[in-house]
Amino acid sequence: MKSFNLSDWALEHRSLVWYFMIVFILAGAFSYVKLGREEDPNFTIKTMVITAQWPGASAEEVTRQVTDRIEKKLQELESLDYTKSETVAGQTTVFVELLPTTKAKDVAPTWLRIRNMIADIKGDFPTGVVGPFFNDRFGDVFGNIYAFTSDGLTQRQLRDLVENARSEVLTVPNVGKVDVVGAQDEAIYLEFSTRQIAALGIDQQAVIQTLQAQNAVTQSGFVDAGPERIALRVSGQFTSEASLRSINLRINDRFFPLTDVATIKRGYVDPPSALFRFNGEPAIGLAIGMKQGANLLEFGEGLDAQMKRVVADLPIGVDVHRVSDQPAVVDEAVSGFTRALFEAIAIVLIISFISLGLRAGMVVAISIPLVLAITFVVMEYSGISLQRISLGALIIALGLLVDDAMIAVEMMVARLEAGDDIRRAATHVYTSTAFPMLTGTLVTVAGFIPIGLNDSAAGEFTFTLFVVIAVSLIVSWVVAVLFTPLLGVTILPKTMKSHYEKKGRFASIFSWLLGLAMRWRWVTIILTVGVFGLSIGGMGLVQQQFFPNSDRPELIIDWNLPHNSSIAETNRQMARFEKEMLADNKDIDHWTTYVGQGAPRFILSFDVQTPNVSFGQTIIVTKGLDVRDKVRTELQGYLTKTFAGTDAFVKLLDIGPPVGKPVQYRISGPDIQKVRDLSQQFAGVMGSHPLLTNMVLDWNEPSRVVKIDVLQDKARQLGVSSEDIATALNGIVEGSTATQVRDGIYLVNVIGRARASERDSIQTLQNLQLSTSNGKVVPLSAVANFRYELEQPTIWRRDRQPTITVKAAVVGPTQPATIVDQLTPKVEDFQKGLPVGYKVEVGGAVESSADAQGPIAAVAPLMLFAMATILMIQLQSFSRLFLVFAVAPTALIGVVAALLLSNAPMGFVAILGVLALIGILIRNSVILVVQIEHLRSEGMAPWQAVVEATEHRMRPIMLTAAAATLALIPISREIFWGPMAYAMMGGIVVGTALTLLFLPALYVAWFRIPRDERVQAEAAAKA
């Protein structure tokens, strides 16, 4: 019975196959146009932020009573990696980090479970705790940010315009979250003179209660008047500052105009919680996000059109500046990636035409676009967009998928030269190479399994690499056995003369080298193993990396002032920096300043910071990569010299998951003071390394507080409680919210506080007049003593242990992993002297890299098992299985050599490339071994079979290697892909050479084939 032949079936149904070929090409072109565009693929931020407030409590009290309860409950979560918390006076912020292996689909249900878990313990918190509140949208991206500035308008007038713009933007199709950034909230201040109201016998709290009672909105009821139901409305609510000024107070049976006891001022919240500037001008920002899954370029076009309408309606003097425009960035990035893809396609096609000739090259030239077209269809169906990873995967796959087409065409040409007719030559492709090619394809795909099954953020980031390469390679095999034979029958001549009767010069040289390697088999094997051993040792000289920095022009400056710094001081330092270094800098396009807060997440890999009055962020957009690094060096030098005591660090954007400062160590233990002391000592260990700079501890310095010791017996005798004193003090210093004025869409707080001259002096506070239970007043100093004390303003914890992180930047191109390796002996010595319960852990880029590589190592056995199973099905021999596997590790020789020569690091992506090399080399090896076995089964002498098979496979293997290597050149210029491209090029070149020389030598050595058999075979042939 004749076995099924897919190539023969295609020739029997030519019209149908042609039809599907045309359909796939048209569908591929349509899908390519419709595919989404992104700069980088999405990955799930597996972080939730929980916040809670306990006004009046110290950082240590909040830690014990609130933070610890939350963290203890969270430890019941199975998918929890760790908790990290920042606690300050009156507030805690807990970061919940899930295990890197948590699947993206399980993240949202986990957030819901956390909400329920914390709800269960809400009753355990002290009285007065507000919250907890949950932010499970920590990964929201605001790709478009606009800054509104004005000349002559008030903040309120400008904010009205921004709010109107926000309403207009919300009508754009696929718009997501839209936030207003840097808007100053209005407030109406009732500023009392404490001496005056004390002299009048007026209690400030009584004034506040009167205002609250008048402004309350309470149900008044309905009246059924015949057929109508009429609502009752009571007037008296405050709608403006004027309505407050007209109030008369009745206190202690006396009437007072409110203006007699308080100065009424309308302004902005003082001090502000956050400020925003564009190019040094006060501004209000509009941060705009897009719904997930939408086409970013289409969204950008719609947003641009809407913003043009918004700008056209703005009054003269209001300017709108584009701060961040992700659609434009993506358009430029995808254009660059696409250009690299077409360059790679051109390189592969040129190689095909040069090596195969015009007609055979034309078959390959049609097959490759067909494979890409079908791949684009699958990408669109799977929701994979065109971005850095998917386009890079297509470029990597190009050099591999051309192999199938070349093998098919080479086989057809060989059969035509042997005298077969065109149809038999075409069908022979399937019978002789289909299953070895399929085995090679599946083995190559299996090499990418560690990427496909890696659930870490890095694995999710690179997941489309696995999908696109797997799809394109499998499609390539289908095209090679289904469409390529039909193309060959149509394009190739019906008969061909042999071009190989006389060997060319290169083929003759190769034959001589092959014979030498096989005759000196053990020398070949020992030399290969020896050089392989040297390459393993050479890996120690290759620098390690997680993900490289971005190739975007932005510079990010994180400002971390001492924790007790005011927002005024943070603003002063940042404004001075802008004036002296940015305002007239010709290398800078524009900059934005965020005081008291960080910038919104304008790209997914941006490291978002929590709001803090002692923190600020400057985002600088330089005029290009050619000046970016120069500007960075200049700015960092100025900051280090000018702002002593401030950690102002200039950094680049990350590609992939953010890591912050590159070199980090954590010191943890049960006692805060001991952890502080140890962290200071460890800072000395890190400081000994000459390549570390801008070292900082994320918390350490204590700050001054005024401790008010209440004389409880005396206070109780006078009818004054600690709560009364705290409320009175807060009303004097920060002010207490009396009520709210409902002004349009805004709620304006009415805040009662002391006059500026009284709230800024400790002496004034000591003389604060307190109302007693008998209606008299006494000074605060009569019932309390004042003293200064040092208190920890911030407490960072990790897994419920006080933890201080020592962070540092790296000078020059040295990678963080290299620094950590060099510090390891000193760190180990330091750890030996630690008390029980204290530890030092590495963090930063090195830890993130380990977290990403851990899942790869866990899945590697599955990859090897899949490869071995596929090969065993094809080879059905342990000996041949060993021979095929033996070549793959030797690619490390080329990998190490290429990385050292190019001074490129072994990053996460380069590791993925090395894993892919295993499949690529095994693919070539299995086809060669199958060819040898096929010739031996036809009766050819073993030695001659090895020689003939190797010489026959030399040309397609060399062509594939050339195509794969040269196709990587366009992406070797990329910061992200460069190390992987160099690693793969080196591995392919060396691995190919060893496949053609080392594998035959190993084969004849393993099967103990005597070298004289070739001579006997040649003699027999001549006879």
Mark where each language-model region is.
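Transmembrane helices with small-residue packing motifs
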Residues: 15, 23-57, 105, 119-128, ...
